[in-house]
């Protein structure tokens, strides 16, 4: 546990203003014909929202970078199936709790989806793009839930008042999907739109579950003691990827169970895992002792993009990385001295959206950025 202490302190600094549920989901790209060309190709989608922003010269995979948000705290932005909109969580500049909004990439128009009360997290479009799923605490109280007790060190709150809700993309027809004791959040949908995956404490630990889109046929697919979260499906729906922390027996396990009983977890290290969609054939992808989170499949289904502080000895700087599903071929994607996280590819594989502290309006300000994705920067440069 001691070897993770510097990273924990850094994690609290970098992410204190961002709800770190890190759903890491989204409607996946077409598995049969992913766009992996050397240079960005023309697309029917026109991004008129936001303002151009210069990428670091070392960020060769990213071109035509645009900053989409500018005030408040903005993160966990995920594409609609047609790639024209995002759904994300935002804390207004004037304060309050995170709420869920949609964002039109052509115009920048935003629409509140959640109730404006309680705290929300982890939003995701239904396949047809007219409904959104998210987690919210508003049924228990319209007030923001109490922040976690930091006297115990840096901890995350897994509020038992979080349940899954569905609403139209304009906030209408709000429907509660789960109503079980404990935390239900971090839901994403399969590319086929037939099942969803989420994290729940309904059986006493933070495990992954799948269920039909109407809330029926719930299946628990992980059972190892520890935190399993932020899962999503591969492009063909056959695999899942998630981040997890499995405490070792002894004091670390005792601390985990004690905090869990208080609705808290201590995010020491987080590693990335993959498995079949039913939870079988689990394989560990990263093994570096750092905080690795927000994994999302590359359009090919053969690589994973994720955020990590592995290259900063102080643990303060998080960047995006690409890695093969077997753990080989690690490549760094972003190079800023600030936080970069929550990456997601667009359904056609041509764009990457993520959250970043670059160009902040105030210290630690997190905003949403989008860029065209270049699969092979060296080849594109020679064109």
Description of each model-found segment:
Residues 344-383:
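Blade-level signature of beta-propeller repeat domains, shared across WD40, Kelch, NHL, RCC1
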Residues 86-87, 132, 196, 240, ...:
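Hydrophobic beta-strand positions that form the internal "hydrophobic ladder"
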Residues 53-73, 103-119, 167-183, 213-227, ...:
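Multi-bladed beta-propeller domains
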Residues 24-26:
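Bacterial signal peptide processing site
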Residues 81-82, 127-128, 191-192, 235-236, ...:
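Residue-level detector of Asp-centered blade-edge/turn motifs that repeat once per structural unit
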